[in-house]
Every structure is written in C-alpha cells, then in structure tokens.
Amino acid sequence: MTTETNPAVTPAYNPSEKQKGAAKTIRIPIKVIPMERLPKPDWIRVKAASPSTRFYEIKDILRANNLVTVCEEASCPNIGECFGKGTATFMIMGDKCTRRCPFCDVGHGRPDPLDVNEPENLAKTIAALRLNYVVITSVDRDDLRDGGAGHFAECIRRVRELSPNTRIEILVPDFRGRMDRALEILNAAPPDVMNHNLETAPRLYKEARPGSDYEYSLNLLKRFKAQHPNTPTKSGIMVGLGETDEEVLQVMRDMRAHDVDMLTIGQYLMPSGDHLPVRRYVHPDTFKMYEEEAYKMGFAHAAVGAMVRSSYHADQQAHGVTSAQSDVVNK
C-alpha cells in the first residue's frame, strides 16, 4: 500500500551518507506503507552458496580491488549460484544512487567522486578471473554531465585491452536529460550487448520508478539500436508490483516496437519491509505463457521465470542471440 508523502514530518538527513530501507524511501513522492507479506509459494527457491564453490574467492578478489557488484548491493537472490560459478555483475561509479526507486535495495545518497582507477581495477580483475562474459552496470549518476557514459566507455576500453576475447554487456541507467551526449560517447566504445531495463508497466512508474520516464527509456533502446543495428539490445521487467498480465504483454509489444532483441522477466521480491510490497506471486504457468508470447512477438531470446534477473545467465542469453544472427548471415 502507498500514500502521498507528507514532507512536514520528514526528518533531516545527511545527503553524503548512503541511505537504505526507510531512510531511502521516505522522501519519494509515494510513501511505502508496510503490509502483511504474502506467503512465498513453493516455486520460489534460492540456491545457497557452498564453501566448495568460488563464492568466497570472488568476494575476496572484489574487496581486494575495491570493486562493487550489483549482486551484493541489490541483494540479488541468485548471488550464491552466480558467485559459485565464477560470474558477477560489476557495478561501477560507486554504491550511492541518485534515484530512490522503492523496489531496489541499492543505497541512495550524494555520490562520491568517480574513482579514476576503477576502469583499470575492473579490467585487471576480469583478466585475473579469466571471464569470458561480463556484465557492467552502475548506479544512476544524475550528478554527472554525461550521466556516467564516459566512465562506462573507459571501462569497456580497458577491459578490451586486457581481455580482448571477453564479451561485454552493459546495463545502463536512462541517462536522463543526457541521452544525446551519452549515445555519442558510447559510439566510440560500444558494448557487445546493450541492456536497459524498463522495470515495470508505465502505469506503475510514479510509484516504482520516480524520476524515470517509460517512453524515454524505450527511446534510448531504439536510438542505440539504430546506431548499432548488429548489436543486440535487451530489456527486462519485474512482475508482482501490481501489474496485470495484459500490461506485461503490452510492455513486451512496446519493446519489440522499439527493436529490443532480448527479454528478461522475473518475480519481484521485496528486499525489506521498507520496500514496495509483493502484490502477487506469478505462477510458473503464467511465466511460461509470457515466454511463449515473447517468441511469437519475435524476441530472439527470452529468459522468463520467477528467479530470473536481468544479468542471470546473461552469457547464455547473448550466445543464443549471436548464434541465431550468425545463422541468418550464413544462409
């Protein structure tokens, strides 16, 4: 449940501190009211980390190189499985986001200055881990004139120098008000896959994505694709925030109308009681319906299921798309 926030009762805060939970969501236009939690169904299962996997090795390497992963910051339920397999989604430009999306567990606050050594540290870490496929994402950096596009480009360049055979997917923010500049910068160092998530249906944007615009995000994906027609584009949404099945299908249609190639749909799981509540748990049969409809609409790949997240098995998704593209070229 949500209501309008009353600014008169909002306490003071230190903007330089990282705010999470209630401290983060208290200043958004919509106030999150705690609700009784829906019981988790049997099909919601998370794989725990095992000491016999690379889970702790990956964590130690990340800390040693002063790197952050969205897996940790966003409390991803798949962290045990992904770290255990030696994969991670790197989050650049710090751990303080300039937005306050109440579904997300990444902290909000005044961001620190960019770490000029981060591209080098990131590239060295990826090379040391001998990763074949990496996903690089970031917090929103509305404080930067290019929205952080230049830092993305520098990270891509350094990774390519040290690991020329590593494929790079970037999961970018919307570069609000800076799209032209951001796309121009990325043209000089394009990724292998361009990902930007719509997150939810447009009706829920005021509640779930304050500060973002549905059409603007769609346009970002379409414009990148127009400039890089051979580079796969990708987007994802969560279900369980109050959307209807028809709204999910319409978002999928909108993606295809804006030339998005790859799709992810997963179940929203609230990180804490201070975040937006789960309003429904989508049945596996419904996820199957989404997947079938996705391929009918022409998506080259659709990763759809309760535990799917934007970067989950991203290497397998991209491999399927590029293999299909190669088949078309060779025919």
From Swiss-Prot:
It comes from the Bacteria. Residues 1-20 are annotated as: Disordered. Its cofactor is [4Fe-4S] cluster. Keywords: 4Fe-4S, Cytoplasm, Iron, Iron-sulfur, Metal-binding, S-adenosyl-L-methionine, Transferase. The keyword Transport does not apply. The keyword Metal-binding applies. Binds 2 [4Fe-4S] clusters per subunit. One cluster is coordinated with 3 cysteines and an exchangeable S-adenosyl-L-methionine. SMART domains: Elp3. One of its GO terms (molecular function) is 4 iron, 4 sulfur cluster binding. Gene3D superfamilies: Aldolase class I. [4Fe-4S] cluster 1 binds at residues 71, 76, 82, 311. It catalyses: [[Fe-S] cluster scaffold protein carrying a second [4Fe-4S](2+) cluster] + N(6)-octanoyl-L-lysyl-[protein] + 2 oxidized [2Fe-2S]-[ferredoxin] + 2 S-adenosyl-L-methionine + 4 H(+) = [[Fe-S] cluster scaffold protein] + N(6)-[(R)-dihydrolipoyl]-L-lysyl-[protein] + 4 Fe(3+) + 2 hydrogen sulfide + 2 5'-deoxyadenosine + 2 L-methionine + 2 reduced [2Fe-2S]-[ferredoxin]. Pathway: Protein modification; protein lipoylation via endogenous pathway; protein N(6)-(lipoyl)lysine from octanoyl-[acyl-carrier-protein]: step 2/2. Residues 82-300 form the Radical SAM core domain. One of its GO terms (cellular component) is cytoplasm. It is an enzyme of class 2 (transferase). [4Fe-4S] cluster 2 binds at residues 97, 101, 104. It holds the Pfam family Radical_SAM. CDD domains: Radical_SAM (cd01335). HAMAP family: Lipoyl_synth. Belongs to the radical SAM superfamily. Lipoyl synthase family. This is Lipoyl synthase. It comes from Janthinobacterium sp. (strain Marseille). The gene is lipA.
